[in-house]
Amino acid sequence: MEKNITPMMRQYLDIKKKYKDAIIFFRVGSFYEMFFDDAIEASKLLNLTLTKRENVPMCGVPYHTSKEYIRKLILFDKKVAICEQASNLTSTGPLEREVVEVITPGVIVDEDFLNDDVNNYLVAISDYKNYYSFSYIDLSTSSLGVMFYENSFFEKLKRDLEKYSPKEIIVSENFYYQYLHKLNLSRFLINRVPAWHLDKDIAIKTIKEHFNILGLSSLGFDEEKPYYISIFLIINHIKNNLKNLLSNIDKIDINNDSSYMFLDDVTQVNLELVKNNNDFSSQYSLYSVLNDCKTAMGKRLLREFILNPILNISEINTRLDHVEFFYKNISLTMTLREAFINIWDIERIISRIQMKRYIKKDFLFIEKALSVFFLVKKLFDKHNFDYWNFDKFEEDSVSKVYFLINSAISDSSDELIKRGYDLKLDNLKDLKINANKYIDEYLESERILSKINNLKIRKTNNRGLFFEVTKSNYSQVPSHFMESQTLSSSKRYKTEKLISLEVDINNAEDSVVAFEQEIFDEIAANVVKHNKVLKKVAEFFAYIDLVVNFGYLAKKNEYKRPVLTSDKEIFLDKSRHPVVEHYVKNAEIFTENFVRINKERHFCLITGPNMAGKSTYLRQVALITLMAHIGSFVPASKALIGITDKIFCRIGASDNLAKGESTFLVEMNETANILRNATEKSLIIMDEVGRGTSTNDGLAIAYSIIEYILEYIKARSLFATHFHELSAINHKAFINLSMKIEKQGNDLVFLREIEEKPSLNSYGIYVARIAGLPLKVIDRANAILESLLSRKGSSFLEFLPYISSDSNDKEALKNDTDVNVKLNEYLELKNFISNIDINNITPFQSIELLNQIVLKVISQSS
């Protein structure tokens, strides 16, 4: 094999050694060829015919259709190295080839590979010297940011992986094996970097060189605290794979965690904020309900808002003011929505232009967007809307770009640069189009000058253009005619002008293409000079599109403006679940419900049957709270909502087989996270905690969780349960709620309406009956239930410690009332009494047993 290998195959093998983890698209003429294992793998994934040549497996795709094949490989989380011919066909020896880029899921910039409404993130995670940081980049939008994890880093890491849903992750090998292997990361492409690649000095040098700065302090970093290592990992990865495609990255956003509501990964999933838990699409998510934006930029900003609710009341109210303006000015809102249809994704277009990956339509799209920009300014001035953050200099900059594109770029498919923009180009185009006309005009001018009436211009393949003069006219040949050939009956002549005209005509087509491209590149370079203001225009459109969208939806769906306060309250009147209401609108009227939570009464226990709407009610409160924090109106007739620093939502659970965790363990892990991290300003949503174990264990755990929240965390909480015994809890902050039902003979009607009283029955057997269980099973279940109820003795809660509302008892509760201990004592006493056979003891023995019971009770009470 080594002896018989061709120079081209040797070239391929040398390149493959450098890109072992990528599928090489090896350019051969008008095809990209793949060889060996690459060919075998690609043929399966792309459904290509696998062939062999000299025992080398191979397959290929045409160059002009290669994008679609590359896109499919990226969807399979594969890396694709594009290897192009670097020399022309006239060179001697084998063609030179080089890898011009490595396309991976996280560094896509081609619009054909991207989703309009979703950012395409590459993420890097660093734990260098125990300075934990998380950096992210969307190369297509020039978004680069970093977060410092100063505490609770693992919980924040899980949150951010869910929030950003990166296509690709870069991480050190040590960090991966220490932490990331604990997570289910099968959906991500992982790049593990050897620890020795993480060098502080090299990182500083690399970042300084890219941003052309003297020190990292100008970016907001302390060089002695290497949180910037994750930024270095991103820059290095892109430089190695995409050569010079970092030119569009000119700033770093350093995110302040305390400015945003904390939504852990479990809460994001359980509330189905941006994707559902069935097929993981956006349908049936909160995002799908709130997304009627007209621009791709607005759609992405909406997703960002939903996953990053803000905590500053002033900032929230500013957003709400803007939404209210468009809510009240619906005619303006509809005009803007119509205009925004003409705005393409200029955020990504600007990035492509900076990276020199532009085409003509990109500039035409910018021109259209900027025309809308001027329209919006006029409309805002007319309606006295004061959100306009562009100064005169920036407006002039936008005008320059608009008029440059408008005067230069043609919207005709026949040309790139408009006529009239460049005189030299116009002349070349005229020459190309009117070659025969110019030849005829020149011929006529020479006829007049020479007075040779039969003077002709002819053309041959060998001699090109020439004048032909017959013998009778030799004496009239002008002095500037240069003889080139003598024939028997005529002579052929050339002139300097004819030679020049011929050269111009022959080169006209190539010259037009080359010169147009030169002018086009100059225009692109001029547009890039205004990239900062153009990015600001893109951000402006995204925000206005979003608040216009919120105003439109508020009017359409009868949402109302929430009032944000600094108090610990959630007051909702006639509230609805935004997602359920949206998707069942044509089927039934959604039942409106109230919520009354304040500083004094902040823990709601919700009981009632399955199917009655408990889970819907829980999510409804959480989603409305979140909507208020992103600046949206909410589905309620009235809403007062205290600023909420964190939302925790533990609803449902399933086995984590990959980690060997049962449903119950998953449930307890999630609950532990809530109890560790919730604060008095948080909102806790818990549904059926404790159901995954025995009744006694589950009831005891649920009780102790409620006790802990009431006494120590004091967060606003909604706790749905089928443990009806818990409704007997006596605490001043405790509220009993239940879902109304109505009996109609043997049937139940679920009214899905909340009321302030406990429910005494879960009606599980009724639900089983309407689900279609056999009648014998239902009858038997009813009989067993009656038997169990007839045997039920004292309330479980009678044996649990009193939950005091008096703050003086808190320390005693901390030190002396371990619920698990008390529960064990209760069970021990219960078993002791249950084992007494009262039919076979003497009076003396009964007195002795009674004495033992009294002593046990006294010892347990001491």
UniProtKB/Swiss-Prot annotation:
UniProt cross-references to Pfam families, sorted A to Z: MutS_I, MutS_II, MutS_III, MutS_IV, MutS_V
Keywords assigned: ATP-binding, DNA damage, DNA repair, DNA-binding, Nucleotide-binding
Keyword Nucleotide-binding listed: yes
GO molecular function, a single term: ATP-dependent DNA damage sensor activity
Spans through the membrane: none
GO terms classed as biological process: mismatch repair
Family matches, as Gene3D superfamilies: 1.10.1420.10, DNA repair protein MutS, domain I, MutS, connector domain, P-loop containing nucleotide triphosphate hydrolases
Ligand binding (ATP): G608, P609, N610, M611, A612, G613, K614, S615
SMART domains associated with the record: MUTSac, MUTSd
CDD domains linked: ABC_MutS1
Family, per entry: Belongs to the DNA mismatch repair MutS family.
Function: This protein is involved in the repair of mismatches in DNA. It is possible that it carries out the mismatch recognition step. This protein has a weak ATPase activity.
Protein name, as recorded: DNA mismatch repair protein MutS
Lineage: Bacteria, Pseudomonadati, Spirochaetota, Spirochaetia, Spirochaetales
Protein encoded by which gene: mutS
